Regions:
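Short hydrophobic beta-strand element within catalytic cores of glycosyltransferases
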Residues: 301-304, 314
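Conserved acidic donor-binding segment of nucleotide-sugar-dependent glycosyltransferases
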Residues: 316-317, 321-328, 337-342
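A short helix/loop element that forms part of the nucleotide-sugar donor recognition site in Leloir-type
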Residues: 85, 189-204, 269, 382
C-alpha cells in the first residue's frame, strides 16, 4: 500500500533494532529497511545468529548483535535458551524500537521486547508458518502462538492480505497495517550485458531457452516438482537452480538432480534474472515472494504456484501464469506453454515489469515502517487501519 504523505516520521534519533533468525535475512531481505533507518539518522542494530553475512550488514552502518542460541529449527530446550538470551540482549541495548521478523523470532522477540520494556515493539508478518492444507495440530500451534505474540506487540505489519485476514480476529483494532513487500527497483531491472555474460559463463547459447528458479534448495520451494519438470523437458530447454543448499532440510535430496544445473548463491542477481527466459517458483509457502518480485522487475516471464504470497505478484494470464502447488503436471504444462509461445513470453515479461514498477518499491515499505514507529511513539491510534493497497489485486 502507498504510504500516506501525512504519516508522521520520527522527529528525533532513535535506537532501532531489527530481529531475525539468521543474518542472511538482515543482509538480503531487510537491506533497504536498514539503509533507510540509517539514512534517517537513527542508530540501527541487527540482531540474529552470527553468520557469513555479518560484514555485509555492518557495511551498511548497522551494528550486528549476535544471539548464539538462535536457530531456524524448533527445539524446546534451545528455544528457551534463545528466549532468555534475547531478553538479556534486548534489555542491554536500551532500544526505542524493536522490529521483529520471521515466524520464530517474531514470536520470541515480541514477548522478549515487551518484557524488556522496549517502548515500541513492531512485528512484520512475512508469511504465516502454516498453510490451509497443513494438519490441524500445526495450524492450531501457529495460530495460537501468533495470537499470544500479538498481545505483546504495539503494531503488526503484513506483507499479504490473506495473512491479515486469517489473523484479523485476534488483531488489536487500529494497530495493524497492510504494507505489502518490495525490492530495490534502482538495482533490479533488465540487464542485457549481464544476460550475455551469465549465459556465456553457463555455456547457454543465444538460441537456447534457459528456465530457472532462485532460492534455498529446500523441499518447500517445490524442488521435487521443478526437478521432475526439468527431467521431462530437458530436451527443449536448459534448467538451472540458483541458491544455497539448506542443511536444515533433510528432504531436499530428491531425484532428477542431473537434469538441473545447480549454481551457488551469486551477488550479481539482476544479471542472473536477466539471463533467464522463464522464471519458475513452485513454492508451497511464501510471505510475498521476493524472488518473484525481482524477476518481474527484470522483465522475466513467470510461472508461480497459486498460493498466498504469489497471487499478490500479479494476475494469472495477465502478469504471469499460476498453477496449483504440488501439481507437477500443471507446472509442466505451464512451462511448456512458455517454451512454445514466444509471444506470450514477451507479453507477460512486459506486463510483469510494469507491475513491478507500480507496486514493488521497497522504499515505500521502509517508509511505512518508519512512520509506524513514529505513530506508536506519539500514541497515535489512527494510523494503519487496514486499507486496500497496491498489493491487493482484488
Amino acid at each position: 500500500m502507498a504510504t500516506d504523505p501525512a504519516d508522521p516520521v520520527p522527529s528525533r534519533s532513535l535506537r532501532i533494532a531489527h530481529l531475525t533468525t539468521v543474518d542472511m535475512s538482515l543482509a538480503l531481505l531487510l537491506a533497504t529497511e536498514l539503509e533507510a533507518d540509517v539514512a534517517a539518522g537513527h542508530e540501527v542494530f541487527g540482531i540474529s545468529a552470527v553468520g557469513p553475512y555479518v560484514p555485509r550488514i555492518e557495511a551498511r552502518g548497522v551494528t550486528h548483535v549476535p544471539v548464539a542460541s538462535l536457530t531456524r529449527s524448533w527445539d524446546p530446550r534451545r528455544d528457551l535458551e534463545a528466549c532468555l538470551e534475547l531478553f538479556r540482549t534486548i534489555r542491554g541495548l536500551h532500544l526505542d524500537v524493536l522490529h521483529t521478523h520471521n515466524p520464530k523470532t517474531g514470536a520470541m522477540g515480541r514477548v522478549a521486547g515487551r518484557l524488556a520494556g522496549v517502548p515500541v515493539v513492531v512485528n512484520t508478518c512475512h508469511g504465516l508458518w502454516a498453510r490451509p492444507e497443513d494438519r490441524w495440530r500445526k495450524r492450531a500451534f501457529v495460530y495460537v502462538l501468533e495470537a499470544l505474540a500479538i498481545r505483546f506487540s504495539h503494531y503488526e505489519l503484513f506483507q499479504n492480505a490473506e495473512d491479515l485476514a486469517t489473523l484479523r480476529p485476534v488483531l488489536k483494532r487500529g494497530r495493524y497495517r497492510l504494507v505489502g513487500n518490495g525490492i530495490d527497483l534502482n538495482r533490479f531491472g533488465p540487464d542485457p550485458e549481464g544476460r550475455r555474460r551469465v549465459r556465456a559463463e553457463l555455456g547457454v547459447a543465444d538460441d537456447e531457452i534457459l528456465v530457472g528458479t532462485i532460492g534455498r534448495r529446500v523441499r518447500e520451494k517445490g524442488m521435487a516438482e521443478f526437478l521432475d519438470v526439468a527431467a521431462r523437458l530437458r530436451q527443449r530447454a536448459t534448467f538451472g537452480w540458483v541458491g544455497p543448499v539448506d542443511e536444515t532440510d533433510p528432504t531436499a535430496g530428491v531425484g532428477h538432480t542431473d537434469a538441473v544445473r545447480f549454481i551457488e548463491e551469486r551477488t550479481d542477481m539482476p544479471a542472473v534474472y536477466s539471463a533467464l527466459d522463464v522464471f519458475v517458483l513452485a513454492s508451497y509457502r511464501e510471505g510475498m515472494s521476493r524472488a518473484a518480485m525481482e524477476a518481474a522487475a527484470c522483465g522475466v516471464p513467470m510461472v508461480l504456484t497459486d498460493i498466498r504470497g504469489c497471487r499478490e505478484i500479479g494476475r494469472d494470464g495477465e502478469h504471469l501464469l499460476l498453477v496449483p502447488p504440488h501439481d507437477g503436471v500443471a507446472l509442466e504444462k505451464a512451462v511448456e506453454r512458455l517454451l512454445t509461445e514466444s509471444g506470450l513470453r514477451e507479453r507477460l515479461a512486459a506486463a510483469a515489469r510494469t507491475r513491478a514498477l507500480a507496486a514493488f518499491d521497497q522504499h515505500r515499505v521502509a517508509n511505512a515502517s518508519l512512520s509506524t514507529y513514529a505513530a506508536v511513539l506519539a500514541g497515535s491510534r489512527g494510523l494503519g487501519r487496514h486499507r486496500r493497497g497496491d498489493s491487493d489485486l482484488r
